[in-house]
């Protein structure tokens, strides 16, 4: 995204930090599913819920691995103990990236709908405010009788 054209709220959604947070959200949701199936002990899951991700650390590791998701998994693993072995269990990179992308799209869609709702209200208010303002009418591409907004 080009910063000067990006609204702050939309920029925050598509930031590297939020992208990695959504990746972590996906990873933890899968860990919860594994725990429900009895694969991951509940005590390990509770520790995994405290995992975090540092985007700068991910980028640092990515320079070595040349793989964003591997770098992410390692960076998250550094924030937990031996429970790190459960992170990314049974997943492909695409499972994480594509699912997180869907979450980002939903978040963006909600922002767009909220903003459109605000715009609708502004346009409605202006239409009511200026409903009696005269303007030149038009028909077949030429000026016609005066009308109001």
Name each region found by the language model.
Residues 1-149:
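A helix-coil-helix interface module used to build multimeric assemblies
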